[in-house]
A protein has these predicted regions:
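Flexible hinge/switch segments at interdomain interfaces of large molecular machines
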Residues: 1-2, 46
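Short glycine-/aliphatic-rich beta-strand segments at the starts of folded cytosolic domains
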Residues: 3-14, 18
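Hydrophobic residues positioned within well-ordered beta-strands of beta-sheet architectures
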Residues: 4-8, 51-53, 85
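Ordered, soluble secondary-structure elements with a strong preference for glycine-centered loop motifs
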Residues: 15-23, 62-66
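Short amphipathic alpha-helix segments
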Residues: 19-38
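Short beta-strand elements
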Residues: 35-43, 83-90
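Short, charge-patterned binding micro-sites
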Residues: 39-61
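C-terminal structural segments of small proteins and small subunits
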Residues: 59-101
Length: 101
């Protein structure tokens, strides 16, 4: 079992206010949640043209995690009002058969 987390940074060039930015971030977050992923803005909340978001999910194996991460990247890159300017991801492997303490 893997827990995967992606950290992404967006540039929102047409945002003239935090309200404009929030609308774009909300749109991205809702699209990601439609894929049953957890998504949250985690930094840069006071900058109206930049956003940093985290996306997290659980996958059964490495191939499934890579597939979902690719879908996340494609989805974010398809948002017309935002440009993906930064991306990093990590996968944490857990042994689901290990005894729980």
């Amino acid at each position: 079992m893997l827990v995967a987390v992606a950290l992404l940074e967006l540039h929102i060039p047409h945002a003239q206010s935090l309200k404009d930015k929030r609308a774009v971030v909300r749109s991205v977050r809702d699209r990601l949640r439609n894929l049953d992923l957890s998504a949250k803005e985690v930094a840069l909340q006071d900058l109206h043209q930049r956003a940093r978001m985290a996306v997290a999910f659980v996958a059964l194996d490495n191939a499934a995690a890579d597939s979902v991460l690719e879908k996340v990247r494609e989805l974010v890159e398809s948002v017309p009002d935002a440009m993906l300017t930064g991306w990093t991801s990590e996968k944490l492997d857990f042994d689901e058969t290990a005894p729980l303490t």
